[in-house]
């Protein structure tokens, strides 16, 4: 969905809001693509948080190197 949204989105501060409105109003099923993208991203981060919770529950934080790599990957994912 990100590729379809990127074809119509502009990141310029003056036109960003109007490009989102264009996606929702003028692109065929643009509202659906936008909602699927938002819900998919939310579900992705919920899965990441569940994975972190599982690691905390099973004590994986004791493996310092593995845990630090995971934290770095989480921060890179959020950028």
UniProtKB/Swiss-Prot annotation:
* Keywords, sorted A to Z: Electron transport, Heme, Iron, Membrane, Metal-binding, Mitochondrion, Mitochondrion inner membrane, Respiratory chain, Transmembrane, Transmembrane helix, Transport, Ubiquinone
Its needed co-factors are: heme b
> In which compartments does the protein localize?
Mitochondrion inner membrane
Q: What are its GO biological-process terms?
A: mitochondrial electron transport, ubiquinol to cytochrome c
Q: Which Gene3D superfamilies match?
A: Cytochrome Bc1 Complex, Chain C
The answer to whether keyword Cytoplasm applies is no
- Main localization is mitochondrion
Membrane topology of this protein: Multi-pass membrane protein
List the transmembrane segments.
1-7, 31-52, 67-79
Q: How is the cofactor bound?
A: Binds 2 heme b groups non-covalently.
Q: Which PROSITE patterns match?
A: CYTB_NTER (PS51002)
Q: GO terms for CC? A: mitochondrial inner membrane
Give the Pfam families listed for this entry.
Cytochrome_B
Q: Which positions does UniProt annotate for heme b b562 binding?
A: 37
Q: Which InterPro entries match?
A: Cyt_b/b6_N (IPR005797), Cytb/b6-like_sf (IPR027387), Di-haem_cyt_TM (IPR016174)
Oligomeric and partner information = The cytochrome bc1 complex contains 3 respiratory subunits (MT-CYB, CYC1 and UQCRFS1), 2 core proteins (UQCRC1 and UQCRC2) and probably 6 low-molecular weight proteins.
Q: What is the stated purpose of this protein?
A: Component of the ubiquinol-cytochrome c reductase complex (complex III or cytochrome b-c1 complex) that is part of the mitochondrial respiratory chain. The b-c1 complex mediates electron transfer from ubiquinol to cytochrome c. Contributes to the generation of a proton gradient across the mitochondrial membrane that is then used for ATP synthesis.
Q: Which family does it belong to?
A: Belongs to the cytochrome b family.
Record's protein name: Cytochrome b
Organism of this sequence: Hypsophrys nicaraguensis (Moga)
């Amino acid at each position: 969905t990100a590729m379809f949204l990127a074809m119509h989105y502009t990141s310029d501060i003056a036109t960003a809001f109007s490009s989102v409105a264009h996606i929702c109003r003028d692109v065929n099923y643009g509202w659906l693509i936008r909602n699927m993208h938002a819900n998919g991203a939310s579900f992705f981060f919920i899965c990441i948080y569940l994975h972190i919770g599982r690691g905390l529950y099973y004590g994986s934080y004791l493996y310092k190197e593995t845990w630090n790599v995971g934290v770095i990957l989480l921060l890179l994912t959020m950028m």
